[in-house]
C-alpha cells in the first residue's frame, strides 16, 4: 500500500444534496422540508420553545437579584506583582497602588479598586496601597518586610 492508494471506505462519504434545483433532481421545490408551516421556513427553532410543554425557564423559580451598589474589584495575585517586579515593570521601592499596577500593565482598568490575593510568593519588600487584600496576602507581604495600607471604601451617595 502506498500513500497515493489510500481512499475512503465504500459508502463512507456522501456528496452534498443540492436542494431546490428543479423537479428532476428529486429534491427540488420544497427541498425535503415538506409543505408550508414553521419547520419548512429557514431559521426553524424558536429558542426556549419546547412544543407547548412549560419551558424550563418558566418551570424554575426566580432567584436573587443584581446589587447595583456592589463593589467590583480587580483581583491581582502576589505572583503577578512579583513577576512585574522581576521584569522591571514595577519599582519595588516606590509605593505600589492601582495607578502603578495599571502603568506596569499588571491590570487593565481599576474599576472600584484593586484587591490583592495571596496566590504565589512575594520576595520583594513593597509598600502597597489598595482597596482590599486577603488576610493571607497581608501576612505574606508583611513576612517579606512590606506594608499594606487599605483604602477606605467611598461612602454611598446620600
Curated annotation (Swiss-Prot):
Residues 21-35 have a biased composition (Gly residues). InterPro entries: Ribosomal_uL15, Ribosomal_uL15/eL18, Ribosomal_uL15/eL18_sf, Ribosomal_uL15_bac-type, Ribosomal_uL15_CS. Keywords: Ribonucleoprotein, Ribosomal protein, RNA-binding, rRNA-binding. Disulfide bonds: none annotated. The keyword Lipoprotein does not apply. The keyword Hydrolase does not apply. Gene3D superfamilies: 3.100.10.10. Residues 1-13 have a biased composition (Basic and acidic residues). One of its GO terms (biological process) is translation. One of its GO terms (molecular function) is structural constituent of ribosome. GO terms for cellular component: cytosolic large ribosomal subunit. Residues 1-45 are annotated as: Disordered. Part of the 50S ribosomal subunit. Belongs to the universal ribosomal protein uL15 family. PANTHER family: 50S RIBOSOMAL PROTEIN L15, LARGE RIBOSOMAL SUBUNIT PROTEIN UL15M. This is Large ribosomal subunit protein uL15.
